[in-house]
């Protein structure tokens, strides 16, 4: 098992850990989903791209990102991107419709 060492408590977050692993063992698998394989480097790249896009839309530390998506690797990438920014990810059940969906969005008060 590859151990990570963080010099500073501020660096101890999943985004930093993935970046460090991408540097150290980049092509090793991070995620296997169905027939797809995602390496640490690929996940790091995707998470960074999503985080940059979310930041460009104004998502910052402590704000909420609501999303309603079917299960899959993309959900993981989006959640990790929110975490990388220090934002809170709010997954919404894809079965919610009408009042349930409206109430969930209203109560979660997402930035995006």
In which residue ranges do the predicted regions lie?
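Short, contiguous pre-domain boundary segments
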Residues: 1-4
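Conserved AMP-binding/adenylate-forming core of the ANL superfamily
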Residues: 6-10, 27-80, 97-102, 106
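Hydrophobic alpha-helical segments typical of transmembrane helices
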Residues: 13, 17-18, 100
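Flexible acidic/glycine-rich loop/turn elements at helix↔coil and beta-strand↔loop transitions
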Residues: 20-26
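Structured binding elements
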Residues: 86
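Short beta->alpha connector loops at strand-helix junctions that form conserved
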Residues: 92-93
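Active-site charged/polar residues at nucleotide-handling catalytic sites that mediate phosphoryl
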Residues: 107-111
